Curated annotation (Swiss-Prot):
Enzyme class: transferase
Chain segments annotated as coiled-coil in the UniProt record: none
EC number: 2.4.1.21
Catalytically driven reaction(s): [(1->4)-alpha-D-glucosyl](n) + ADP-alpha-D-glucose = [(1->4)-alpha-D-glucosyl](n+1) + ADP + H(+)
Name used for this protein in its record: Glycogen synthase
UniProt function note: Synthesizes alpha-1,4-glucan chains using ADP-glucose.
Listed transmembrane segments: none
Pfam family, one: Glycos_transf_1
Species of provenance: Pelodictyon phaeoclathratiforme (strain DSM 5477 / BU-1)
Record-level Gene Ontology MF annotations: alpha-1,4-glucan glucosyltransferase (ADP-glucose donor) activity; alpha-1,4-glucan glucosyltransferase (UDP-glucose donor) activity
BP terms from Gene Ontology: glycogen biosynthetic process
HAMAP family cross-referenced by the UniProt entry: Glycogen_synth (MF_00484)
UniProt xrefs under CDD domains: GT5_Glycogen_synthase_DULL1-like
Gene: glgA
Lineage top rank: taxon: Bacteria
Length: 489
């Protein structure tokens, strides 16, 4: 079978621009396109959340994919499917919908308040079983189902148990990618026992009457990946990074690979971006100042010539660095900067940041609601992107930023050290702090600010950043090889 005949289904809880909760959505927006360019046929399945605007994204019903029965042991629920093309591509994206499960804002985390939703078990089981039932009704058989994070972790086990005897699913391989090891999907075993046959529920990884979905995906997938080589090493060998999964990852190390993320340079191109105030390039950088002014206006902050604008774009939780950011606020406010904090999540952090902005109305702004337009404008308008997250499997935002001449200041770890060339006297594309503390973060930011005020040095670092190659080409070729090896008889 030639490579061009291979079919890959990507299953995820989020895909940008339809919904973005974490960097996984950015991955899903661009990686399937890169794989298609390698000669595969790619399709996507995700939940149809209540926040997804059918008209905006041109979703339409598929009559032959209506009223699909999803057997949840003690009940049968119906599934309907809508479809559209992933923007700027021909990749069919299927949205699985049932009002009872998906009408609320989020499937696993409420986008607006950040709290875990009650009853996530029935939602995740419905979604995972629904994916397989939809494939059967659709009659499109993938060679590989590539599952992302715990939201899709049940599919490899389902294929090896209740669906193993189905002719349609014979020989389908599974790949499971870990984007967020600290989000593992810990759910009550009793709920799974009510929804799944005994042969499935008994094979789930259970401890203290709780199921670990991420662990289950690791155990049963045919191939495991994560989003950088350094991160793969860290989560196998570094006890601080594994969050209880070190042993199972070490057991399956032979099938575990780290492949660095890339970005879609067509979507993230400052010279062609339709979502920013004014397009610009390395040869014509004047437009970046226009974007800076537009960003400040959007954020409700005054423009002051020569004052750097520093931005933080993150989920408000401890893993993404909200706690460290909170610890750093007073020191940041003492610097001659303007600070824009964009994100949502834990209400505790939201209140802290909003209160701090009220105390510093001319210097600090908090932007809560995610939108593609603000995200792109921020990447284009910021001078410096501050990344306080302790754990960064790879991240893509620092690559977006460097493409746009926005310089990252980030904590060392995972894909950060693979994507940011640390600044020294001669070269570099960003700044990295190695001690996870407020003092280290602020100290490294001060280094970046000193560079900013040295025009020649700043031009050099911006040029280095904007000429880095972050395209998916190399990573897609690595996945191409892994996929083909997995499918060899």
């Amino acid at each position: 079978m030639s490579r061009r005949n291979f079919k890959v289904l990507y299953v995820s809880g989020e895909v940008s621009p339809f919904v973005r909760i974490s960097p996984l959505a950015d991955f899903m927006a661009s990686f399937p396109q890169a794989i298609e360019e390698e000669g595969f046929e790619a399709r996507i399945m995700m939940p149809k959340y209540g926040t997804i605007n059918d008209r905006k994204f041109r979703l339409h019903d598929v009559l032959r994919l209506s009223d699909i029965e999803v057997d949840l042991k003690e009940k049968v629920d119906l599934l309907n499917v809508k479809v559209t093309a992933l923007p700027s591509s021909k990749i069919q994206t299927y949205f699985l919908y049932n009002e009872k499960y998906f009408k609320r804002n989020g499937l696993f985390t409420d986008i607006h308040n950040g709290s875990d939703l009650k009853g996530s078990t029935d939602k995740v089981v419905f979604f995972n079983v629904g994916v397989l039932e939809t494939l059967q009704r659709l009659g499109w058989k993938p060679d590989i189902i590539h599952c992302h994070d715990w939201h899709a972790a049940l599919i490899p086990l389902l294929l090896k148990t209740v669906y193993a005897s189905h002719e349609f699913f014979r020989d389908i391989k599974t790949v499971f990618t870990i984007h967020n090891i600290y989000r593992q999907g810990i759910l009550p075993m009793k709920a799974f026992q009510k929804l799944l046959p005994e042969e499935v529920s008994s094979a789930l990884h259970c401890s203290n009457d709780e199921v670990n979905m991420l662990y289950t995906g690791v155990e049963h997938a045919d191939l495991l990946t994560t989003t950088s080589k350094v991160y793969a090493e860290e989560i196998v060998h570094d006890g601080l990074q594994t969050y209880g999964l070190g042993r199972v990852l070490e057991e399956h190390q032979a099938k575990f690979y780290g492949i660095l993320n890339g970005i879609d340079s067509r979507q993230w191109n400052s010279a062609a971006d339709k979502l920013i105030k004014k397009r610009y390039s390395l040869e014509h950088m004047d437009g970046k100042l226009d974007n800076k002014k537009a960003l400040l206006e959007e954020a409700g902050l005054p423009y002051t010539e020569g004052t750097p604008v520093v931005g933080v774009i993150l989920n408000f939780d401890e893993f993404q660095g909200a706690e460290l950011l909170q610890q750093s606020l007073e020191q940041l406010a003492a610097l001659d900067i303007q600070l824009i904090i964009s994100g949502s999540g834990d209400k505790k952090y939201e209140k802290v940041f909003q209160d701090f902005a009220l105390e510093h109305p001319e210097q600090v702004s908090v932007h809560g609601e995610y939108s593609d337009s603000f995200f792109h404008l921020a990447i284009a308008g910021l001078d410096i992107l501050l990344m306080p997250g302790m754990i960064e499997s790879c991240g893509m935002i620092q690559m977006f930023a460097m493409n746009y001449g926005t310089i990252p200041v980030a904590y060392a770890g995972g894909g950060i050290v693979e994507t940011i060339e640390e600044r020294d006297e001669e070269s570099g594309s960003g700044f990295i702090f190695h001690d996870y503390s407020a003092e280290s973060l602020v100290g490294k930011l001060e280094e970046a600010l000193a560079c900013f005020h040295d025009e020649e040095s700043w031009q050099q670092i911006v040029m280095t950043a904007m000429t880095r190659d972050f395209t998916w080409k190399k990573s897609a070729e690595e996945y191409d090889q892994l996929y083909r090896e997995l499918l060899e008889p």
